[in-house]
């Protein structure tokens, strides 16, 4: 596909939720320690509405990965795309293959343009009191970043490829920011990796919508992979 770096794995079908399968694989790879699962549960966020639902893993999985930098950073686009490839390919496919016994087709598309956000990292990641990544009125700041990323690439992407059940909604979207995630020891101005449902779905071309996303860190290296898989 034009505009993407893609990697495909072939297979069949599996019927368990993707988040638990990927979490198990990430935990097994990066630490054979029971405390890792508890750590991930305690150090990542899930922001969603009560009736928010995500699609369980499908016969054919297609994931879109978008990369975002910040106005106070000077990361090179080629380096960040390469870092995303190193983090995800072929590791994500290998976990899917192992845990599904080769029964899932997984394609990962890493968009080949990096978006530079209009604001600093702290503008999207600062904590207010005990509220993670939120301003004083409770607004979840990284969701603003996610909206900016999606709007930026709205016309450049065939979003229908990531609608896995043909209901008009994007099912798999991973946004990778270039900084270190707060869950791996960053300061209080950094972004916690998370999964979130938009309060109101974003409109996309051709009648598509984006109702949720996962966000994780490129700067956290191997820890970033485990957390990214957890959030997906």
Regions picked out by a protein language model, each given a short descriptive name:
Residues 2, 24-32, 36-232:
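Active-site-proximal segment of zinc-dependent metalloprotease catalytic domains
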């Amino acid at each position: 596909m034009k505009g993407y770096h893609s990697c495909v794995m072939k297979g069949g079908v599996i019927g368990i939720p993707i988040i638990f399968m990927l979490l198990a694989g990430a935990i097994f790879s990066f630490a054979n320690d029971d405390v890792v699962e508890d750590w991930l549960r305690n150090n990542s966020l899930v922001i969603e509405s009560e009736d928010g639902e995500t699609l369980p893993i499908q016969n054919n999985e297609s994931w879109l990965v978008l990369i975002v930098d910040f106005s106070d950073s000077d990361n090179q686009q080629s380096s960040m795309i390469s870092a995303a490839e190193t983090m995800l390919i072929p590791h994500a496919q290998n976990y899917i293959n192992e845990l599904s016994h080769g029964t899932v087709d997984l394609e990962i598309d890493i968009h080949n343009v990096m978006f530079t956000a209009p604001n600093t990292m702290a503008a999207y990641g600062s904590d207010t009191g005990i509220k993670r990544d939120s301003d004083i009125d409770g607004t979840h700041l990284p969701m603003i970043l996610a909206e900016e990323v999606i709007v930026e690439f709205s016309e450049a992407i065939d979003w229908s490829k990531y609608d896995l059940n043909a209901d008009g909604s994007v099912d798999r979207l991973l946004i990778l920011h270039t900084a270190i995630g707060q869950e791996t020891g960053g300061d209080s101005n950094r972004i916690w990796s998370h999964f979130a449902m938009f309060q109101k779905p974003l409109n996309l071309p051709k009648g598509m919508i984006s109702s949720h996303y996962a966000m994780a860190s490129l700067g956290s290296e191997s820890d970033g992979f485990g957390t990214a898989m957890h959030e997906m």
